[in-house]
């Protein structure tokens, strides 16, 4: 995955991808690739055990998200951009590929609810907090989120046992397979757009990264140890997606709302680079504590 990051960096630095081009790729990920990842994860045979595990993963995922939001508020309540950036991980762009790499594509089933909830909260509460305008906290805004829609569609497919024909599953799987390389290429472009010297010499960014990459994952592991042994794989999935770096959407929202997008990009980039060290450590710790 690190190689894809380098490719994105080089493509931008050599002018083969522009800033507008990277925005288009990010939209492709959000509106097409990630929804296909979610829908594909629900194209499996229904079972009562699977239904219970899905409910557990959504409930536990909601708890983990609330934990992250509470921790970020505690540390950064006077800095809305830092608070929202730290609260919401890059669960879609980095979490999904990591879950697939570590546990297999089937495990994305357990991450889908978390990622959809995260995006819904980021889309509504996140933008409201950043802008100071509560107009973003509306049901209509939630229902326009592509990941929420794909989760709802996936739940209907799964519980109603709707067969998805092969001619749809094949292209859906192919598009879903683009997630890891495309997401990391986009992150590489973000990195290339940033002044690396400014990133590494700004102490505030290290504080943000420490909370996002160390404090929150450690608390997540402690809380998920309460899950029964039979549900530890669900715990592993949630640890992976909640140990991911600061979500890149914070940069998109900052730019859209006319805020300091360079600050947002810097926090995304430094936390992404540092996560190459912290993620293996957190996964190793989780494995040592009995997670799958």
Identify the residue ranges that each predicted region occupies.
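Alpha-helical transmembrane segments of multi-pass small-molecule/ion transporters
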Residues: 1-292
